[in-house]
Amino acid sequence: MLAIDHIAKNIPFAKTYVPIQRLMPTRHHKQLAVFVTLVAFVLSSLTGCRLFSSRVTLETLTTAAEIERGGDQLYKSGHYDTAANRFEEAAAMVPTDQLVRRKLADTYWAENRYHAAIAMMRTAIDLAHPAIDRELRQEWFVRLAEMNLDIGNVDRALHWVDRAIEENPQMLPARVVRGSILERVQSYKAALEDYHYALSLMAEESSAERVRVEIEVARIYSHQRRPHRVLAMTSAIDPRTLQPTQAIDVHLMRATALRDRQRFADAVGELQQILVLDTNHAQARFVLASTYWQQRDIVRAQNSLAEVLRLNPNHPAALRLQQQMASPK
């Protein structure tokens, strides 16, 4: 959203004024000047309007909006460096425009200028009005949390997502992001609480986001060695509808859970599905080797283990299984 569009959205009569001022004939310049003065007076009296001040004229806003639109097009076409220049120019013209700074943060992030992006996102949040931009600020809290998590700053990530949830406990994206943060630091119980709360807010029918959260919940159950929970959580997921990496994750978690419940044939079936997608998947071949070993199918276990070590000679679990196979009965 452009700065001038933000004004039109939040100031009722500005919705009609913006197109009208473009149509006014030249002979009405005096009336226009009076009207602009009136608009400036009214806008400056509104506590929530952070985009307009006596130092920023409507002409400046319009020019900045045109520059910002140019930045939008450059960003969409992947010309991030030039887009950043446009957004910086627009931001300099309207120092209180939080929206262009939000775009600038995304552009810096696309350029891998991570710390600059985080700093700019904080500036956008500071400029946003707590009441008028309440939902927008909450979204930005979550985005800032994601940025910090991506660069490994877990404490700051948790700080920002907590702020979003404090303001809106039912904010779905915030619950999902906090779940991922807590999962990262292995606070599995707390992560499950957020993930399950997020699932309760989602529609029952399957969606890409719901499946993604279900996979993360199953992953935690897998870490906790709770195979029955893994199978229950993934039972409604059809791997054929997923991207290959997601499908492999689901098959692998199912296979491990089935092996642990001694449903060996079903486990092998899941692992074979993985090898169709990726014949060189070392972890799948290891689980296959361990499944055959538990079945007492020694020859197949040894052959599968040899494949694992060919793909990854330093696979820790495979090396332990190799020692176990070599030890006297």
Please annotate each region the language model reported.
Residues 76, 110-111, 150, 184-185, ...:
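Register position in tetratricopeptide repeats
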